[in-house]
Amino acid sequence: MKVAIIGGGVAGIAAAYTLLADKNVTAVHLLEATGRYGGRARTDTTSIPGFAFDKGAQYIQDPTLNPLTAIAKKLNFDTVEEDAVYRLRVETEDGWETLPTTEPQVQAVVDEIQASFDENSKKPNVIVAGKPRKIEEVQLFGHATSTYGPFTESAETWQYIAADRAREAKGDGEENLFVVKGIGSLVAAWGQKLRPTSGSTYVEHFGAVVSKIAYDDDKVTLTYDSQSLTVDACIVTVPVSVLGDGSIAFEPALPDAHRNALKVLRLGSYKKLALRLRTSPADIVPGTNYYLAEDDPPGVWQYYRLPHADDVLIAHAAGDFAAALDRLPDSEVFKLFKTRIQTACDGVFFTTGRAMTNWSNEPAARGAYSYTAFTGGGPDDPNALKARDALATPVKRVYFAGEATDPSCYGTLQAAYFSGERAAVAVLHDVHAA
């Protein structure tokens, strides 16, 4: 049995390991558009010397349930518990102060969003909560600190359906684990073990941009660059943004259910920047995450210093704010953040070393992680809620994986892992049966 995998992220790597464990598999070809393993798990180790800046996935979530915990241990990657607290940084009559995220006015907004979610999630096609009529600091903070806000979902509460989030599996309640050398480095190291452990059965093709997938009942033929590859089955793990914009042509066209799913499954926006500090500012305590409102474009920065790397200041933006920042030159974004943080905090000075992400403009990603968009229709319309399962359904010998196909923990690395494993098991079952 000869199988192709498109995409070298966590889903593709998990699929490869699962397939290669079966003695009936004679060849596994992994085609990756970039020159590396990892997908949206990517660590930058050069922009800030001595610091591993995770540009995508930040940490191992639900460590007792997440396969990456065991992989990190096996590959000798040290981890550190997050153990974070969260605070607001606000300007008051007495100057700048650090306040609890449960400030009454902010908590009232959070409670409103929760009540809206509780009610709206009873129907399959209703948004979490409406867009605020006025964009004021209290509203920005409320949406930023809500568990349904953009820092969790990469989309705003008025952009995605509540019922999709309501299916999310309960986590283990344990602290997230930072990977000291970077979670992207961990995933890359895991992928790089495939060839040494599998010999000639495994072939990796980096820089292979797949442009067409032709399939029938018995085989799949991939076209990439000026080459083609025919296999017994193919697992597609590329992001829904790439599938949805027609970058890969399917012959014949995918069924209506898949095409409709790709209209509502989208990638949100999430942005990170990191700057090396020249000083150790007393207003930014390592291990504390602070929320700081920005006026133009309106949004919220989430910034912090890591206990194990307290000489670097990291800032996040999400949702519409991140999308607006992604449209600006990097130099303007750095200037915007530096001006704001130095206004809000004393003693913040920077030295050489900085890094920034822009997933919106990454050709192989075109966004952060998935959400199920509200695109209209009545509250009882079931189609959007069916999108993740619809996309995960095989089409003859073509199988789909990736975090967007997992309803229970979408948007996470473990979702990508489980989906890749699931698709590989389905390939083995179906081809053996045939």
Located regions from the model:
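FAD-dinucleotide binding site
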Residues: 1-434
